[in-house]
Amino acid sequence: MAKSAAIITFLFAALVLFAAFEAPIMVEAQKLCEKPSGTWSGVCGNSNACKNQCINLEGAKHGSCNYVFPAHKCICYFPC
């Protein structure tokens, strides 16, 4: 009985050790800074169009319509 308990303990320890080394490595997310679009004119009412314009014309990672007093503006997100 003692021999089987030692084997089970060893297998459990080996499993924990294996899991510790095989855990996926988390990469730190890249921080994004926002900047009003330089190519958008007027009030922003379509976030998808804003996103496409920010990505295609300004080289941003993302874009969306955000409320910036006094109206909605197209905001582009770039790596900081």
UniProtKB/Swiss-Prot annotation:
Enumerate the Pfam families for this protein: Gamma-thionin
Alphabetical GO biological process terms: defense response; defense response to fungus; killing of cells of another organism
Q: Which InterPro entries match?
A: Defensin_plant, Scorpion_toxin-like, Scorpion_toxin-like_sf
Q: Where in the cell is it found?
A: Secreted
Tree of life domain: Eukaryota
Q: List the disulfide bonds.
A: 33-80, 44-65, 50-74, 54-76
Major location category of this protein: secreted
- Cite a GO CC annotation: secretory vesicle
Family listed: Belongs to the DEFL family.
Please give the function described in this protein's UniProt entry: Confers broad-spectrum resistance to pathogens. Has antifungal activity in vitro.
Q: How is this protein named in the record?
A: Defensin-like protein 14
- Its source organism is Arabidopsis thaliana (Mouse-ear cress)
Q: What is the lineage of its organism?
A: Eukaryota, Viridiplantae, Streptophyta, Embryophyta, Tracheophyta
Which gene carries the instructions for this protein? PDF1.3
